[in-house]
Amino acid sequence: MAIKRLTRTDAAERYVGEQLERMQRAIVYNLQYIGEQCVAHARSLPSPPSEAGASPHQPNYIDRTGNLRSSIGYVVAIDGKVVEGGRFPSIKEGGEGAGQGEEFASEVVAREFPHGIVLVVVAGMNYAAHLSARGYDVLDSAEVLAAKLVPQLLQSLGFEVS
């Protein structure tokens, strides 16, 4: 008995393409959720009062201008193109920080992630890495949160996580 194909090739290809598109939308949606959670966490860290001469209490830095918190945000990119995120609302007078954050996130995507689906969470001010290296929590606890949420995301989408 011969095997006979009943489904047209283009119908099968279309079905596979639709399923890939559906999975991609689900991944982007879930990465957005993780990005929003990480940004909300990082921006909500307490800032000690900035009395004259007072030093910050680690792990929290003093947020004098709002630029650093305003530069914290996320983007989701597919094959080097930002598809979601990119909103960096200003806190206090932190308009400069918001612009720096958007610019830095786009640079990171273009430079580091030309292929695949990625979530990039950034603190775009040039001194963010310096504060983090000195022990202040700029994005550190947000990174821990992401490391917890990503495996949950993958499992919910049917991927095996080891």
Question: Model regions: which residues?
Answer:
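N-terminal targeting and processing segments of secreted/endomembrane and organelle-targeted proteins
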Residues: 1-3, 20, 27, 147, ...
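N-terminal, Lys/Arg- and Ser/Thr-rich interaction peptides
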Residues: 1-22
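Short, low-complexity, charged/polar segments at coil/turn and helix-coil boundaries
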Residues: 18-127
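Protruding loop/beta-arch "assembly-hinge" segments enriched in small, turn-prone residues
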Residues: 132-162
